[in-house]
């Protein structure tokens, strides 16, 4: 199975974004996965869509979490997306 596309949507000066990125990086490293970060302030459509929900976790394009990411839930989501 191919590696899931794990993306965290963030914006500048967002303390929840910093926390979410750490939780995501830690969980992804446990599974040997990569994640990417997208700054919504550089994309007006994303900024309009997600302005009130940042940070947002998307796995394979689907929104799976927002605001505070629960590490246990994230691990479960990554396990499911990885087919493990």
Task: Explain the meaning of each model-derived region.
Residues 36-53:
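Thioredoxin-like thiol-disulfide oxidoreductase module
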Residues 21-38:
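Conserved helix-turn-beta segment immediately C-terminal to the redox Cys motif
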Residues 62-84:
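Non-catalytic, surface beta->alpha helical segment in thiol-disulfide oxidoreductase systems
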Residues 55-63:
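A short, hydrophobic beta-strand/beta-hairpin element that forms part of a small beta-sheet core
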Residues 1, 30-32, 51:
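Short, well-ordered coil/turn elements that cap or connect secondary structure elements
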Residues 2-26:
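Local sequence-structure signature of Cys/Sec-based thiol-disulfide redox active-site neighborhoods
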Residues 19-22, 49-52, 69:
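Generic recognition of short, well-ordered alpha-helical segments
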């Amino acid at each position: 199975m191919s590696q899931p596309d794990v993306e965290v949507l963030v914006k500048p000066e967002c303390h929840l974004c910093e926390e979410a990125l750490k939780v995501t990086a830690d969980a992804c490293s446990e599974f040997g996965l990569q994640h990417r970060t997208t700054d919504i302030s550089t994309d007006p459509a994303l900024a309009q869509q997600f302005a009130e929900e940042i940070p947002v976790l998307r796995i394979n394009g689907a929104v799976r979490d927002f605001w505070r990411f629960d590490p246990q839930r994230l691990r479960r989501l990554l396990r499911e997306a990885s087919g493990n």
